[in-house]
Amino acid sequence: MKIISSLGSRLTNSLPIEKKQRALVEFVINTYQPQQRADLFRALTEHRKNQLLNLFPEHHNKSFSILFELMDYRELIRRYPNTFGEEIAHLEQAVSECYSHWLDFWCECEIAAIKTLFPIEADAPHRIELPLKDCAYRGFLIDQIEDSELWVTTPSHPQKMPIKDAITLSNLELFIKGEKWYEMLPLLSLSQKGKHFVLLKHPNNEASPTLVASMLVQDWSVNQTWLSYAQQFSNEQWQFCLPDHSYDVLMELQLFKPALSKCDSLPEFDHQFRRQLTGTQAVCEVLRLTVSGNAQQKLYFLYLAQKKLIQILNQMGYKIGFTIIEQPFILNFYQTIEPKSYFRSGYNDLNNNGKQSYRGFWMIERMDKVFSDTNFRDYRHAVSQRRKYDLTKRKEKEYA
């Protein structure tokens, strides 16, 4: 009852919504230990998710951002009261008055928890210069991010922190909060362990390097946890679009026994790929390409991060890199390159917002050649020209 009383005293009706939100976040961070907090968020998320799926079974393959917005959060709580005890019921009731849904609140708590651990000091730089010059940055793979002793800052939080926390903060701010990829919340631990590519700005006047881009790289040995093979990303609602000539290109790699045969759906292709792959050490999944900065800087870091990672993967002997991409700048560029370098395998409008997400894969040796022959000016020009071409085609359809 003391906790409930403490919560109530922080949320008087006269407070502005921003102060109520801040008070709620501070309450959760100060009341629950990290593992308690993680267990609470996961358990209540799973509970509400299952409730919503029972109410709207036709949305079982849709994203969390769609599912959790199908019904007004306050109405959901009113009709289906919380069964996790009085304390959690009061907490969720308070959250429903301040946030659009539980996942929105979870994300804000995780962001605040990291920033609270590493408060900005008085001598921290107010602004970090991010020049568009390749020589100002270095990119490399870290095998076990949880064991790394590297400390960095981020453009949004110029206070040094362990690289695993900086990657997590970037994923939270740019992917989960920015793009509403709430599916990443229960899997946030993947941002804090395993193999990651990082792109860092060399320290200039700053005390520490600055993280400007990162990617999660998962080997075949953990393919059972790949996002590409999760139910949401491998089902019949995905339009299969793998071109016929891709089978010959894949066969040339000599990674399959027997060779892959033509498929009619994405789940069928996934099943055959997993069953017949023998060269498992040459295949990986690349996810969570997170970039910082303004619009121009983000485009530049998209280019440079891909270029440097693909070069490293090629040097290490990787042949195929699975991807899930929604970012138009990346997709526009891929449509301009040598057609055997990248293959789309399927697409789906996961968020019902008119934006297609594409599953596909890099042919890494060919992609390395593409990026070796491409500077940022070429990349930007190719993206711009493709965008103009698509716009012209769209207008032609409208007037046809």
Swiss-Prot record:
Protein name stated in the entry: Acyl-homoserine-lactone synthase VanM
Entry-linked InterPro entries: AHL_synthase
Entry's family note: Belongs to the LuxM / VanM family.
Record keywords, A-Z: Autoinducer synthesis, Quorum sensing, S-adenosyl-L-methionine, Transferase
Catalytic reaction list: a fatty acyl-[ACP] + S-adenosyl-L-methionine = an N-acyl-L-homoserine lactone + S-methyl-5'-thioadenosine + holo-[ACP] + H(+)
Superkingdom of the source species: Bacteria
Its EC number(s): 2.3.1.184
GO MF, one example: N-acyl homoserine lactone synthase activity
Cited Pfam families: AHL_synthase
Keyword Transferase: yes
Coiled-coil boundaries: none
Broad class of enzyme this protein falls into: transferase
Keyword NADP recorded: no
GO BP term, example: quorum sensing
Role: Required for the synthesis of N-(3-hydroxyhexanoyl)homoserine lactone (3-hydroxy-C6-HSL) and N-hexanoylhomoserine lactone (C6-HSL).
